[in-house]
């Protein structure tokens, strides 16, 4: 049995990983899917003070208070920024798993890892236009057309604190000595894969590489597939 802590991406919440957690539990694994401060069912805590450190501390505190050991720490998308920093705060992480996720080095910000044209159109301009300069609405509402209605509605109404994308990651070099895997979701339209370059870098680093023929939100589009890959990685890391 492995212990997974799975951290969701921007505009999301732990709710979107529940099907994956259930599938892992059926295989005997212990799985936590926390929701980061200001998002999902914790959206009532949304404030200007929330930054990347806040979210990393959310995860570190979960690991401490649950007395979790030998944790397989999984980050999806923006969640990779969070898990990398959280792993720098605690000693209980056994291995890192990035699911179509950002993989920062010390001092890097998420906006440093995205094409500048996407930073402006996806984050900065929407925050100026409709987020009082500090909140980012969900930038891809048209991409939700194939999702279940309740899932699409949760994303469409979500807002994410901009500071989490512009704060630098405080990364202990020790984190990069941990066994690490990168799961690349390869079913995205041409020209819209923000993570293809990061997948190549992960391969060059000698990390374990897995591919799933899914869109970016594999936890919604293919929960059984991602659960199977995570289950397999648990025996290899």
How would you describe each model-predicted region?
Residues 154-173:
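Active-site nucleophile elbow and catalytic-triad environment of alpha/beta-hydrolase enzymes
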């Amino acid at each position: 049995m492995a212990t997974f802590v799975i951290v969701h991406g921007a505009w999301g919440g732990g709710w979107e990983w529940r099907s994956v957690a259930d599938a892992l539990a059926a295989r005997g694994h212990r799985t936590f899917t926390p929701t980061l401060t200001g998002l999902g069912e914790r959206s009532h805590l949304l404030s200007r003070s929330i930054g990347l450190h806040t979210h990393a501390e959310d995860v570190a505190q979960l690991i401490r208070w649950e007395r979790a050991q030998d944790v397989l720490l999984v980050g999806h998308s923006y969640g990779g920024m969070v898990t990398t920093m959280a792993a720098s705060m605690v000693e209980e992480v056994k291995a890192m798993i990035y699911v179509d996720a950002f993989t920062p080095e010390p001092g890097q910000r998420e906006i440093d890892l995205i094409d500048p044209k996407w930073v402006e159109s996806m984050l900065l301009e929407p925050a100026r236009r409709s987020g009082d300069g500090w909140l980012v609405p969900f930038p891809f509402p048209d991409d939700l057309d194939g999702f279940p209605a309740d899932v699409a509605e949760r994303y469409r109404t979500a807002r994410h604190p901009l500071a989490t994308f512009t704060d630098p990651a405080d990364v202990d070099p020790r984190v990069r000595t941990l066994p690490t895997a990168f799961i690349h979701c390869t079913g995205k339209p041409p020209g819209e894969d923000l993570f293809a370059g990061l997948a190549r870098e992960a391969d060059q680093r000698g990390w374990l590489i897995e591919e799933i023929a899914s869109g970016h939100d594999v936890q919604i589009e293919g929960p059984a597939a991602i659960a199977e890959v995570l289950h397999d990685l648990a025996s290899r890391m």
